[in-house]
C-alpha cells in the first residue's frame, strides 16, 4: 500500500485488496483449516516453503497475512508477525534470537508462564540456561 495514505486510511485498508470475484472490500475471516493446490508439485513446494501459499491455517492464512501487513503499514515497518498469545510471542522471540548454549538472564518477577517456559521447555531441550 502506498506510503502516501494517512494513518486512518491505513487502519482500514492496509494489507488488503478488493476481492477480484466478489468485489468485496472487507477482509473475510478464513475459518478453513486446509487449502487446495493446483497439483502435487505445487503442494510439495508450498509444504517445503519453496513457494508461497497456504497449507494449514494455524500456521498462516489470508486473514493473518492481512493483519500482519496492516500492522507493519501502521508502524511504518516492512513486516510484522502476529501470535495467538503473549507467551507464544515471547517464545517466538526467544527461539529466534537465542542459539543452543546461550544463557538467558531473566528477572524472577517475570510472568510465570515465561519463567515456566524458560526453565522447563527451553531447559529440557538443553538449548539454553536460565539465570533468574
Please provide the spans of the model-predicted regions.
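Alpha-helix C-terminal capping segments
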Residues: 73-74, 92-100
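Conserved PLP-anchoring active-site segment centered on the Schiff-base-forming lysine
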Residues: 96-114
